[in-house]
Amino acid sequence: HTSNIEIQNPDLLHSRSKLDFGKGFYLTPLRIQAEKYGERFLRRGIKAMLNIFSLDDERENCTYKVFNSYDGEWLDFVMACRKGLPHVTFDIIEGGIADDQVFNTVDLYFSGIYTREQALNQLQYTKPNRQICITSQYVLDKYLHFQSSKQL
């Protein structure tokens, strides 16, 4: 997780809504992706901190959703979350991130310039980055463990 501060105890109160998978604490298993996100802070002259966590493999009483590709289900879910529409919620959601390249396609779809089919056709050739969104404070407290932080 990249932020402008060290975060040892994440809480959902500080999470923004209307993101790819809704309001939650976002992480990635891809260090290079987290460091690249930190560059956004640095370009604005803001300190960037890479916060490293471990997430228990065994998680009881959690709902978990994985999107393995940028498909119709992913597109519909992201659209509902980004527009703040009602949608099925999960404690943990994992799937592709709407980075700059993907966001352009998604934005064209949201604005009505692309049809759903055109957007999906564009997205099918894109290899998903990985993001994990934890939407449950219970899961954050019980299964996510702060390991260390590093200033980028």
Where are these regions (language model features)?
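A short, exposed loop/beta-hairpin motif centered on an aromatic-Gly-Thr core
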Residues: D20-Y26
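Conserved NAD+-utilizing ADP-ribose enzyme module
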Residues: I7, L19-D20, E35-K36, R40-L152
